[in-house]
């Protein structure tokens, strides 16, 4: 049974092209490390959508096109406490001036884990995929709620 219950995604645009280096430095050395002490944060990863990746996207849409980075925090129980602490920490860091200002969140939020898959060639269980090193991801986001 997979202990990961939720993935909190953030799809981010950097609004000033000169700010990518500063954003990466802030995110890797300040913002992301602050999340890991929170109970319920199991893992965090961030991926860049390079120009080549953007050209290879299966879908183009006004909301998706500007996305430069996707961040994912994997969360375990207790979900209510974890999500509250996660949001509270973001607000506290922002109040301290520790939030990158040249960014725009285009989409994001907590999404329940529905199913995981692993190719037979990788020889690991599907449940272990979040812990396996990777060089990239292919993300699909679907609304599975009833109309």
Which sequence ranges carry the predicted segments?
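Macromolecular interaction modules
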Residues: 1-147
